[in-house]
Amino acid sequence: MAVPARHTSKAKKNKRRTHYKLTAPSVKFDETTGDYSRSHRVSLKGYYKGHKIAKANAAE
């Protein structure tokens, strides 16, 4: 089994981990429904790029 030859320092470990971060999801305002939604996804009301393509949920 492979084992590191040298101990990884805290600084080296933390420099590597600087790129592990969360990013906020891209959100756009949909003029058709008046809601905010994720880009390139069908809104909760069944609209995509201003066109009705799916039935809305029965919860509305």
UniProtKB/Swiss-Prot annotation:
A GO MF label? structural constituent of ribosome
Which residues lie in coiled coils? Answer: none
Record flagged with keyword Ribonucleoprotein = yes
The answer to whether keyword Metal-binding applies is: no
The UniProt annotation puts the region (Disordered) at: 1-23
Q: Which family does it belong to?
A: Belongs to the bacterial ribosomal protein bL32 family.
Name of protein = Large ribosomal subunit protein bL32
- Name the source organism: Streptococcus equi subsp. equi (strain 4047)
What phylogenetic lineage does the species belong to? Bacteria, Bacillati, Bacillota, Bacilli, Lactobacillales
Q: Which gene encodes it?
A: rpmF
